[in-house]
């Protein structure tokens, strides 16, 4: 099949993070600081990505501001002609630090928020962070950069959807993404504590719809549904190895940020193989491209080019088979697995297991 060049690179510069969010989708086993790619290696990755056709670079983590070479990496990506987006907790994003990044070509900031007020947000983040995030947002707007606010929704903050929208308005956000938790990595460990109730989901959707209509043309609102409760799966990555690739802190190259969960796939790394060769020719990137890998019901389903069989990582985590129909799909023979999870986990009083920093020091 014909393979197009990727549009975007998610550069996960580090797994280190000042927050301890229970919904973190990074792997349970994090990359230690000593095993992160060096500055020179990241510069080579950026060069190779641009040669491959990448136009957007999203610098993320962990917390990318913990890399002292961040201005150099932003500058290289910008000099190559890429649109550079910083995905950050905001901790450490002072006006002077931001000015240095803007001077090097930073074009956009995505800022995570955990709740609509400091008490709730700081409890979820496991750190006193909320007020510092608001200061970071003020700095972004003062610098003239577009601001996106990202909120991961779960049982502990779903009742704040309306207040979160109002908060994003006050922050001057251009875009608000309200994304229900995806259960990968550390978040999977906390699924029973994170899964919202049906009542919470039903209450949130009309609030989001009304706000999206009211704010049309002023603030874009993107609502990512809780796919466990949907009839069909989300079109994960708009197809495996189709639009974007991820380079993890240690150089592993992934078709999606959570793909390391599929332990049956070989792991490619930029230290052993070129980015171009990985994108076009590796087993891991070609495993689920197109629809030739599909089995029924996906193979003969009219939605196979709409949702692409759903999420490969979710299929593997719930069934042990990455080629299975995503079990959140109502047509999946494994839908009962998801129904049982909803029945047993969506309304139990389970405490968070907070993410700790020790593994990445």
Segments predicted by a language model, with ranges:
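Flexible mid-to-C-terminal extensions adjoining Fe-S/redox cofactors in radical SAM and related proteins
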Residues: 1, 260-361
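Radical SAM enzyme [4Fe-4S]-AdoMet core and its adjacent flexible, acidic
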Residues: 37, 83, 99, 103-104, ...
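Short strand-loop junctions, especially beta-strand C-caps/beta-turns
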Residues: 27, 62, 152-154, 316
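Short, conserved clusters of charged catalytic residues that mark active-site
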Residues: 8, 40-44, 93-96, 132, ...
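Flexible loop residues that form catalytic
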Residues: 29, 62, 114, 181, ...
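Conserved alpha-helical substructure of the radical SAM core
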Residues: 1-104, 108
